Amino acid sequence: MDDWKPSPLIKPFGARKKRSWYLTWKYKLTNQRALRRFCQTGAVLFLLVTVIVNIKLILDTRRAISEANEDPEPEQDYDEALGRLEPPRRRGSGPRRVLDVEVYSSRSKVYVAVDGTTVLEDEAREQGRGIHVIVLNQATGHVMAKRVFDTYSPHEDEAMVLFLNMVAPGRVLICTVKDEGSFHLKDTAKALLRSLGSQAGPALGWRDTWAFVGRKGGPVFGEKHSKSPALSSWGDPVLLKTDVPLSSAEEAECHWADTELNRRRRRFCSKVEGYGSVCSCKDPTPIEFSPDPLPDNKVLNVPVAVIAGNRPNYLYRMLRSLLSAQGVSPQMITVFIDGYYEEPMDVVALFGLRGIQHTPISIKNARVSQHYKASLTATFNLFPEAKFAVVLEEDLDIAVDFFSFLSQSIHLLEEDDSLYCISAWNDQGYEHTAEDPALLYRVETMPGLGWVLRRSLYKEELEPKWPTPEKLWDWDMWMRMPEQRRGRECIIPDVSRSYHFGIVGLNMNGYFHEAYFKKHKFNTVPGVQLRNVDSLKKEAYEVEVHRLLSEAEVLDHSKNPCEDSFLPDTEGHTYVAFIRMEKDDDFTTWTQLAKCLHIWDLDVRGNHRGLWRLFRKKNHFLMVGVPASPYSVKKPPSVTPIFLEPPPKEEGAPGAPEQT
């Protein structure tokens, strides 16, 4: 053994080392896979058991149903038991047919719930001020009308009186105040609330809260009122809970003859309220009109686009006047509604007209602008052969000779490329400044409010660059910009053929309407023959203006133009005055003159090359801006142009009233 030596080919013996990390990981992974397979197998077995149990339950259920069908006795027992149960309070029969009504009034929130269903909830900031009114069907309890009247603002109480008077007797009325509803609640409105049985409504004070439920012409079901303790605070919130008994269906329905017109009327009157005699059971007002045809009607096949939103009572009034106008073609009318509102479409269906709804795009001014674009595009797509389109809005009254006015003047748009549009509206045509329904003007502004648009202008110029949805622009102000108008003018009448009656809208309220729209003159004379229509073409109009200026009597420029004595007490004369206007955009004196004449003064409208035309004391009155107007050459050398300096601005002057 002493001479033994280890073989150099054999690896020396050493102690066993620890397993490597790789082998450890591989071992654990193998165990995890085994565990996963075990879990999967268990899940499959569980699913199989579940399926077997479900199949057994289905078979047992079918067998039970089969046995029940063979023995009718259990069904009879069930029916007897069901008959002993109390029916649902809203739809059941018998003396328990009542509605549970909750009405809440407070400074910042109102809500109304009927049988646990909220039918009104308004807690938006700076919106919904005034008296909210809901009308329920007395037989079914469903909501027939929802309105809000901002009786803090002028004339909204008149709108509320009109609405409540047009609600049929027997309907359930619910009233509630948000924020403030008394400031312009006049005696007529208070007397009406008193006639409805309200005790607190006629005594409603500054910032009081009030809730009321009653039947028109019937009993009051509940009323709550909280007075404001001080001018700077509001009344406490009030919550009125009351039961309203339902009437029979017989009491809520009218029995008209079964005609196509009355079927339309019945569908309408069963759903909505506030439309007066159209739903009268005894003597309903007509919903079909037969105005005299218009001889040689040049606009018979011109499409009419009515731009509408969610103001159905406005739309109803507008469509009645439109369908009563001589020369109207109902099949050419399309009402475009911005949003999927039911009631405006109900109004459209009542009159048997075409209505199109679309999804609103954008917000505020941009939403209105996109609505106009979509409506104009759709109009020309619906009538691909039409060269023109008449554009109206839902808050306009239409004169009886509206289509006659357009028929006599529309050829000017075809023959004179210097024209932008024909409008039925005169921005400066007030009761004291408009006189001659046969007289037309050319003006540099686009008045809108009932106008004719040329297809080529829209498709080639306006549509491709119409303001996009992110631009919060007014569509009409955009159309008046020099880039769009490009020196072209519009034809307007001295006496407007449309009347803007709407006092609720994006850019409208009672104060604004009172100041700038209420006293506009509106033609009511049928069959007016327009005078010297072809003299409105570009070159001919210049000849006419120079003739008028040459014949006009120059007024005494030493007198105050704002005084009534500035014009003599005559009738049928033509007078001219010259005012300072240093350059084309210098309207300092004109703006002050417009203010004292109580006409449109918010921007410059109704002018033609520095010339304004209107009537005062039934005399034709012309005003020329010197030296900017080319008609300045008519100024006698001895006459000094009138200059009216604007008053200094008062610091901290209050603006228009907002939410209280």
Swiss-Prot record:
Q: What's the effect of swapping residue 207 to A?
A: Decreased enzyme activity. Impairs protein stability
Report the pH profile. Answer: Optimum pH is 6.0.
Chief location category: Golgi
EC main class here is transferase
The residues that the entry says bind a carbohydrate are 129, 179, 207
Q: Where in the cell is it found?
A: Golgi apparatus membrane
> What are the protein's GO molecular function terms?
acetylglucosaminyltransferase activity; beta-1,3-galactosyl-O-glycosyl-glycoprotein beta-1,3-N-acetylglucosaminyltransferase activity; carbohydrate binding; manganese ion binding
Example of a GO cellular component annotation carried by this entry: membrane
Q: Please state the pathway this protein functions in, per its UniProt record.
A: Protein modification; protein glycosylation
Q: Name one GO biological process term.
A: localization of cell
Q: Which domain of life is it from?
A: Eukaryota
Per the UniProt topology annotation, the Cytoplasmic ranges are: 1-37
PROSITE patterns found in the cross-reference section: GG_LECTIN
Instruction: State the protein's purpose.
Output: Participates in O-mannosyl glycosylation by catalyzing the addition of N-acetylglucosamine to O-linked mannose on glycoproteins. Catalyzes the synthesis of the GlcNAc(beta1-2)Man(alpha1-)O-Ser/Thr moiety on alpha-dystroglycan and other O-mannosylated proteins, providing the necessary basis for the addition of further carbohydrate moieties. Is specific for alpha linked terminal mannose and does not have MGAT3, MGAT4, MGAT5, MGAT7 or MGAT8 activity.
What is the protein's given name?
Protein O-linked-mannose beta-1,2-N-acetylglucosaminyltransferase 1
Organism equals: Homo sapiens (Human)
The root-end lineage is:
Eukaryota, Metazoa, Chordata, Craniata, Vertebrata
Name of the encoding gene: POMGNT1
